[in-house]
Amino acid sequence: MAIHKWKLWKQRCSTCSDALSTTTTVEQLSNTPTTNPLTTCVGAKEAQTQQRKRQRLTEPDSSTISPLSVDNTNNQIHCGSGSTNTGGHQSATQTAFIVHLKGDTNCLKCFRYRFTKHKGLYKNVSSTWHWTSNTKTGIVTIVFDSAHQRETFIKTIKVPPSVTLSLGIMTL
């Protein structure tokens, strides 16, 4: 540690006298921060002191934010046996019909590139992504404007046997 301090001190000095031995200089640096009359350093006082680390910026307390303040709509999808909502009803919020393709990441990437021939059959396609807990299975999300467009896509595109297809609705 003392040698490291000495090297830092030596680097900060633009002109230093080598009249003192290394041992004397190290002892001086480790004991007191005063300067020796035989050695002089030219430079600003701020340059000779070690810089402190920057303070972290404080983030607002997230515990004060209620779930309703993030999304001020109170729309719920009811999927119970007595519910008439089958998942196809679009409420006041923006919902999108989606398909998740799950499988090997390289297979999904190649399959996704083949979609460019059928651009009218979907709205958007995500890149290949995966959950952090499961890195072996990749997922591609395809977004559609309507349920009819999604059905046309499923009928037109031949899905490889190693890829599984899941239907869903996503709130945007």
UniProtKB/Swiss-Prot annotation:
Pfam families attached to this UniProt entry: PPV_E2_C (PF00511)
Q: Which residues cross the membrane?
A: none
Keywords in alphabetical order: Host nucleus
Q: Which GO terms describe its molecular function?
A: DNA binding; DNA-binding transcription factor activity
List, alphabetically, the GO terms of the cellular component aspect.
Answer: host cell nucleus
Region named Disordered: 45-69
Cross-referenced SUPFAM superfamilies: Viral DNA-binding domain
What is any one GO biological process for this UniProt entry? regulation of DNA replication
List cystine links: none
Q: Where is the composition biased (Polar residues)?
A: 60-69
Superkingdom, according to UniProt?
Viruses
User: What InterPro entries does this protein's entry cite?
Assistant: E2/EBNA1_C_sf, Nucleotide-bd_a/b_plait_sf, Papillomavirus_E2_C
Q: Name its cellular compartments.
A: Host nucleus
Q: Which family does it belong to?
A: Belongs to the papillomaviridae E8^E2C protein family.
Role: Plays a role in limiting the replication of viral DNA in keratinocytes. Recruits the host NCoR/SMRT complex to viral replication foci to mediate repression of both viral replication and transcription.
Name under which the protein is recorded: Protein E8^E2C
Q: What is the lineage of its organism?
A: Viruses, Monodnaviria, Shotokuvirae, Cossaviricota, Papovaviricetes
